[in-house]
């Protein structure tokens, strides 16, 4: 198999592009580095294309390794024909490869292997040849052997049919055809074990749909219902069609003696061996497809959450709401440094509202707080009412925002949080996290396991290794897309930088603590375990403001410093001029093709350098929608059908999007209500987490706490 050609066809890109990326990966380059600094080499493939390429490359290389193992095993058995070898080499999927290997794979003792041990293979061959001129019973008498425990004709025939049933089940072409027919004509069926029981799975109590039309969220919901022993699930295959197909393949000539036995054997082979295996394979395939889709959605949601714009330059009060144990508050300054913490008790059972207002007002005055970040967990609504009431009594403009606190409790109890705030309890740490999430969502959220951030669907039911890897890639892409301040970044943030491992991240922080601020990127080479390759991979993503070289504060890679300096000189600038940005530089450097030749660099790279010099250290998050800050409260009972509201998309799932409209119960915009202009294949084609949108209230169900919305575009 030509792996590069295969991937190029699948991803609809050029073979040379795939070969270039394969070479870079084999040299130890990371995807963020390849995406940003090797565009010339691979023709400007984007992050997503590169991730898909890397994933397929890993799969196909593993497949090639498995082929070598399979070929060696069959050759060792002396059963490898040229035809079989070519079939194995041509196999493009793991499933097809394993189908080809099935007849030769070492087996545990089966009914067929036991029958072979009893010497019944000859009888099986006679039946399969369909040439007998006398009864099968007569033929079977020759195979009776008391020593081998074949004492009756029935035993001999039964054993022979077992051998044939397994041979039929192991035939790769048959399995491929049956799998295809089942997928095309079969149905996924689920029923309730107890139809009277009220559960969230009632939609699946009497459910049936064609396999080819099962959606990802249906597969995952049914799987969970089965796991919780609420649903019984099966695949209903077109059995008559399949048995007809097998009969046509196996019974090549009608024989009054052998045909009845072959028909019996075919039915047994299908029902006992083929059908259960195909059902397992198809359900695994449905699950894998559903998981891949859910992971993709989770990744997109996570990306949007991490790329929320920072609210810079504000002193923030983080508010972690609670009832019995009190609300934990933490004040953090513009840089995220903790200035103060306190516990207040405005909620049940103590209801110290007046005292809470007095304390918080004093904190607002003392620290010049302009924003309150309230966690959306238990007692959030009660806290919000107290805050809104208090804000009306202030003589200064202070706003609040309800912040998704998912994962804050996980972080606050973690080893990392303990190291960061050894003298704080978990509530205080959580309040700090809730405040910092507004100031720099990316820097704070990287401290939390992405699976705990709360923007996924059925994440606990998925392949955890695959999920963690995919989400880790998303975080890595976001961190490198934004860039990291080398002198302020935590080890948690640094470890996602291209080329930086956990150990190197800790070593960078240690070096900083022992030697003070980094003054240049070159200084990174003094960090323990950070060698030339790691430096090449990470340097461009690590920024130094106020360092020796102004280029260290940009995304220009050190390997291009000479070119950047030469370019500036040609256009009449000096290095020092780039500090505030060189607006209009691209207009001065119109003929990029000619300029690229003059400075000795590729045109694509030159354009990137010019773009960066125009606005050094640009933050892509600045282009994202800003969060909605509030000063008044809206309650669910205030909602009326037809109301137009502004909200923030909190989560996107296969069947719609949940929108926060400020009433502590997210409303659902069903996929059919996202737009009236076109068919929507997936909600992510229309909205993303963090989008600020206008919605209309369609229906409010106070009893079930459900709000149905439609999008206004």
What are these regions (language model features)?
Residues 180-188, 319-323, 378-379, 403-410, ...:
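A glycine-rich phosphate-binding loop feature that marks nucleotide/adenosyl-phosphate handling sites
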């Amino acid at each position: 198999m030509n792996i590069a050609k295969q991937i190029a066809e699948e991803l609809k890109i050029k073979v040379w592009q795939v070969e270039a990326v394969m070479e870079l990966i084999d040299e130890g380059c990371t995807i963020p580095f390849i995406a940003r600094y090797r565009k010339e080499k691979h023709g400007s493939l984007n992050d997503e294309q590169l991730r898909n390429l890397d994933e397929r490359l890993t799969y196909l290389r593993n497949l090639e390794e498995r082929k070598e193992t399979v070929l060696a095993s069959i050759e060792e058995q002396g059963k490898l024909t040229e035809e079989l070898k070519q079939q194995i080499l041509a196999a493009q999927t793991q499933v097809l490869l394993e189908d080809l290997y099935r007849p030769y794979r070492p087996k545990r003792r089966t009914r067929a292997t036991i029958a072979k041990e009893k010497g019944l293979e000859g009888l099986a061959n006679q039946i399969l040849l369909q040439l007998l001129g006398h009864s099968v019973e007569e033929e079977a008498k020759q195979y009776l052997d008391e020593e081998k425990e074949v004492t009756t004709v029935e035993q001999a025939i039964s054993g022979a049919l077992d051998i044939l049933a397994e041979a039929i089940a192991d035939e790769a072409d048959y399995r491929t055809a049956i799998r295809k027919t089942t997928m095309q004509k079969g149905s996924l069926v689920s029923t309730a074990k107890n139809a009277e029981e009220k559960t969230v799975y009632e939609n699946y109590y009497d459910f049936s749909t064609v396999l080819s039309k099962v959606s990802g969220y249906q597969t995952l919901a049914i799987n969970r219902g089965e796991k919780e022993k609420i649903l019984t699930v099966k695949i209903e295959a077109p059995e008559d069609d399949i048995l007809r197909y097998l009969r046509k393949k196996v019974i090549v000539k009608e024989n009054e003696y052998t045909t009845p036995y072959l028909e019996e054997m075919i039915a047994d082979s299908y029902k006992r061996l083929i059908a259960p295996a195909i059902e397992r394979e198809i359900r695994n395939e449905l699950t894998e497809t559903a998981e891949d889709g859910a992971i993709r959605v989770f990744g997109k949601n996570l990306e949007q959450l991490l790329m929320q714009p920072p609210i810079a330059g504000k002193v923030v009060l983080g508010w972690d709401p609670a009832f019995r144990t009190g609300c934990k508050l933490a004040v953090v300054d513009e840089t995220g440094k903790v200035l103060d913490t306190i516990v207040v008790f405005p909620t049940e059972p103590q209801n110290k509202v007046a005292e809470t207002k007095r304390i918080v007002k004093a904190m607002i005055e003392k620290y010049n707080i302009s924003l309150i970040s309230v966690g959306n967990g238990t007692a959030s609504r009660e806290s919000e009412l107290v805050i809104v009431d208090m804000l009306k009594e202030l003589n200064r403009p202070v706003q609040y925002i309800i912040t998704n606190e998912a994962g804050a409790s996980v972080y606050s109890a973690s080893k990392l949080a303990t190291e960061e705030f050894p003298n704080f309890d978990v509530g205080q740490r959580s309040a700090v996290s809730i405040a910092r999430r507004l100031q720099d969502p990316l820097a704070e959220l990287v401290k939390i396991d992405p699976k705990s951030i709360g923007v996924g669907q059925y994440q606990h039911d998925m392949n955890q290794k695959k999920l963690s890897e995919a989400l880790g890639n998303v975080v890595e892409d976001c961190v490198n897309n934004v860039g990291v301040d080398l002198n302020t970044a935590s080890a948690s943030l640094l470890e996602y930088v291209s080329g930086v491992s956990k150990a190197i991240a800790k070593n960078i922080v240690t070096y900083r603590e022992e030697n003070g601020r980094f003054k240049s990127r070159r200084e990174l080479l003094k960090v323990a375990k950070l060698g030339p390759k790691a430096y090449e991979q990470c340097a461009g993503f690590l920024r130094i403001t106020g360092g020796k070289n102004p280029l260290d504060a940009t995304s220009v890679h050190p390997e291009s410093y000479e070119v950047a300096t030469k370019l500036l000189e040609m256009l009449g600038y000096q290095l020092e001029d780039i500090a505030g940005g060189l607006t209009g530089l691209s207009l001065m450097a119109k003929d990029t093709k000619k300029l690229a030749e003059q400075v000795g660099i590729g045109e694509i790279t030159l354009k990137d350098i010019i773009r960066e010099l125009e606005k050094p250290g640009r933050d892509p998050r600045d282009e994202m929608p800003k969060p909605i800050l509030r000063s008044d409260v809206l309650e669910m009972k205030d909602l009326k059908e037809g109301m137009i509201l502004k909200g923030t998309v909190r989560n996107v799932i296969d069947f719609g999007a949940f929108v926060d409209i400020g009433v502590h119960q997210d409303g659902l915009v069903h996929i059919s209500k996202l737009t009236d202009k076109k068919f929507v294949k997936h909600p992510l084609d229309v909205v993303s987490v963090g989008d600020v949108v206008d919605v209309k209230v369609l229906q409010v169900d106070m009893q079930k706490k459900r709000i149905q919305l439609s999008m206004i575009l």
